[in-house]
Curated annotation (Swiss-Prot):
<dbReference type="InterPro" id="IPR027417">
    <property type="entry name" value="P-loop_NTPase"/>
</dbReference>
<keyword id="KW-0479">Metal-binding</keyword>
<feature type="domain" description="tr-type G">
    <location>
        <begin position="10"/>
        <end position="201"/>
    </location>
</feature>
<dbReference type="InterPro" id="IPR004161">
    <property type="entry name" value="EFTu-like_2"/>
</dbReference>
<dbReference type="Pfam" id="PF03143">
    <property type="entry name" value="GTP_EFTU_D3"/>
</dbReference>
<feature type="binding site">
    <location>
        <begin position="76"/>
        <end position="80"/>
    </location>
    <ligand>
        <name>GTP</name>
    </ligand>
</feature>
<comment type="subunit">
    <text>Monomer.</text>
</comment>
<dbReference type="InterPro" id="IPR004541">
    <property type="entry name" value="Transl_elong_EFTu/EF1A_bac/org"/>
</dbReference>
<comment type="function">
    <text>GTP hydrolase that promotes the GTP-dependent binding of aminoacyl-tRNA to the A-site of ribosomes during protein biosynthesis.</text>
</comment>
<dbReference type="InterPro" id="IPR005225">
    <property type="entry name" value="Small_GTP-bd"/>
</dbReference>
<dbReference type="InterPro" id="IPR031157">
    <property type="entry name" value="G_TR_CS"/>
</dbReference>
<dbReference type="InterPro" id="IPR050055">
    <property type="entry name" value="EF-Tu_GTPase"/>
</dbReference>
<dbReference type="InterPro" id="IPR009001">
    <property type="entry name" value="Transl_elong_EF1A/Init_IF2_C"/>
</dbReference>
<feature type="region of interest" description="G4">
    <location>
        <begin position="131"/>
        <end position="134"/>
    </location>
</feature>
<dbReference type="GO" id="GO:0003924">
    <property type="term" value="F:GTPase activity"/>
</dbReference>
<keyword id="KW-0460">Magnesium</keyword>
<protein>
    <recommendedName>
        <fullName>Elongation factor Tu 1</fullName>
        <ecNumber>3.6.5.3</ecNumber>
    </recommendedName>
</protein>
Length: 391
């Protein structure tokens, strides 16, 4: 099935397979590429290369394929720990996920944990592939497993009653056996993914935000901040807010330059210098953000989901307890924060993932799903994501 080069005119969506070990995530990934992309065999996907994201090494396999409607980038991880790290660090962003559950086993501990993680890190939508249906002869048993999956999804605030569940066999698809549960099921799955997982809003259509990396003054012109526009568009003459660390203030962008050329606007992905009206060099600093007024607010207290590195990954050698005070690295700067562990959790060991409350000593421009690194003296010891803002 030779395919021509990918058309970039289609909307692009990032997805991934999640679910319990040996339920068939990698086989399904291979089967999807067989019908919608350049076929990648199970072994090619399973031998995932290691990558580093936020100082953490993660094994992830990336494949790409396309349906009539969309172009997809798909990630599959070989080990459970890789999933946890991947979802928390956002190394591979997911606009949606395909949850793979073996019909023979039903939901297992990692099924539950991946659904919880998907909820915590804000994966917007899930479609289910009920795999290995050829191993279950009893239709009632299949119904029970489906019911169990729906209940589990609902428990973690996904719309369990509405989520599409496609029954099939990834192996049958790979081996060209029983077409109804093989090829047909994989095609049906992708049509459900096309229709059920929303197309993400492009960064350029979102409200403007630029994390400040550097500040300097140009004599006779004023104060310039530099950084990469994270989202949205900024036009010369627009009013913006300076948010985080200090009280929020307003200013007007009087100039935008890129590669020493003056522009009338900067947009998501551009590295720009922005000239600000009436801002003193001392009144602004790295770690603050420029943003569209009212679009983002400063906060100090939040709930987070975090992964703590093992000693081998260069992390801590010892556990930590409530009142642990590391630095939290948000976007471009470190801020000290105080950790409170949930009731019933005495300590956190290197290699754990944990839900925790954090209180920062100064406010940071913050939204749910914002990611951060946890550092001690400049060394990364963990990674996390804001799951809920408290104040």
């Amino acid at each position: 099935m030779a395919k021509s080069k990918f058309e970039r005119t289609k909307p692009h969506v990032n997805i991934g397979t999640i679910g319990h070990v040996d339920h068939g995530k990698t086989s399904l990934t291979a089967a999807i590429t067989k019908y919608f992309g350049e076929f990648k065999a199970y072994d090619q996907i399973d031998a995932a290369p290691e990558e580093r994201a936020r100082g953490i090494t993660i094994s992830t396999a990336h494949v790409e394929y396309e349906t009539e409607k969309r172009h997809y980038a798909h990630v599959d991880c070989p080990g459970h720990a890789d999933y946890v790290k991947n979802m928390i660090t956002g190394a591979a962003q997911m606009d949606g996920a395909i949850l793979v559950v073996s019909a023979a086993d039903g939901p297992m501990p990692q099924t539950r944990e991946h659904i919880l993680l998907a909820r915590q890190v804000g994966v917007p939508a899930i479609v289910v592939f009920l795999n290995k249906v050829d191993q279950v002869d009893d239709a009632e048993l299949l119904e029970l497993v489906e019911l169990e999956i729906r209940e589990l999804l609902s428990k973690y605030d996904f719309p369990g009653d509405d989520i599409p569940i496609v029954k099939g066999s990834a192996l049958a698809a790979l081996e060209d056996k029983d077409k109804s549960i093989g090829e047909d099921a994989v095609r049906l799955l992708m049509s459900e993914v096309d229709n059920y997982i929303p197309t993400p809003e492009r960064p350029v259509d979102q409200p403007f935000l630029l994390p400040i990396e550097d500040v300097f003054s140009i004599s006779g012109r004023g104060t310039v901040v530099t950084g990469r526009v994270e989202r949205g568009v900024i036009k010369v003459g627009e009013e913006i807010e300076i948010i985080g660390i200090r009280p929020t203030s307003k200013t007007t962008v009087t100039g935008v330059e890129m590669f020493r050329k003056l522009l009338d606007q900067g947009q998501a992905g551009d590295n720009i210098g922005a000239l600000l009206r009436g801002v003193d060099r001392e009144g602004i600093e790295r770690g603050q953000v420029l943003a569209k007024p009212g679009s983002v607010t400063p906060h100090t207290r939040f709930k987070a989901e975090a992964y703590i590195l093992t000693k081998d990954e260069g992390g801590r050698h010892t556990p930590f307890f409530t009142n642990y005070r590391p630095q939290f690295y948000f976007r471009t700067t470190d801020v000290t924060g105080i950790v409170t562990l949930p009731e019933g959790i005495e300590m956190v060991m290197p290699g754990d993932n944990v839900a925790m409350d954090v209180s920062l000593i100064v406010p940071i421009a913050m939204e749910e799903k914002l990611r951060f690194a946890i550092r001690e003296g400049g060394r990364t010891v963990g990674a996390g994501i804001v799951s809920k803002i408290i104040e």
